[in-house]
Amino acid sequence: VSNGCVCCVMEVSSQGIKMQRVEGIFFDIGVFLNIEPDHIGPNEHKDFDDYLRCKSLLLKQCKVGIVNRDDEHFEKIIEGHTCSLETYGFSPEADLRAEDAKLVGGKGYLGISYHLKGLLDFHVEIDIPGKFSIYNSLTAIAICRHFKVSEENILKALKVAKVKGRIEMVKV
C-alpha cells in the first residue's frame, strides 16, 4: 500500500479460512467459483460439509460476494452471507448470464462465444473453448464491472487472456 498498490487479487483457500490466516481482513470482493470434493482428508477438511462451511465463510468477510449461480451447492454457500450478492452463470436467475454459447473455430483457432445479459449486455468471444472458460470470463467481467472497466477494455483483455499449456494449439 505504501508503494502505491491500490488493488490486490489473492486466492484465499478454504484451509486458509479454516486456519484463520485471513482473520481480520475484510475484502471488498469475495468470489466463489465452484466446489468439488477434492480437499477432504486429514490435512485439510474432515468431510465435505466442513469444506463447504469453510468456503462459505468468505461471504461473511467481504462487502460484495460474486457467486456462481449454477453451482449445485449455491444455496449452502450463500447461507448466512453478510455481503451483498451478485451471481453469474447460465441460470436465468443469474445477474450476469451467458446465453447462446457457441464454439467458434477456424484455421488454427478454437474459441467460444456467448451473449452476456443481465447487469451488462454485450457479445463475448474468448480464445479458450469450454464451459469453464465461460465461467472464468463471467467472473472476470463481474469483477471488472465493480472497477468500472469499460466494455471495450474487458473485451480486449478477454481476447488475449491465456494460460500457458491450457488448450494451447500445438503445430505439427
Segments from the language model and where they lie:
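Flexible active-site lid/hinge loop adjacent to a nucleotide/diphosphate
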Residues: 1-80
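Adenine nucleotide phosphate-binding catalytic loops in nucleotide-utilizing enzymes
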Residues: 44-52, 79-172
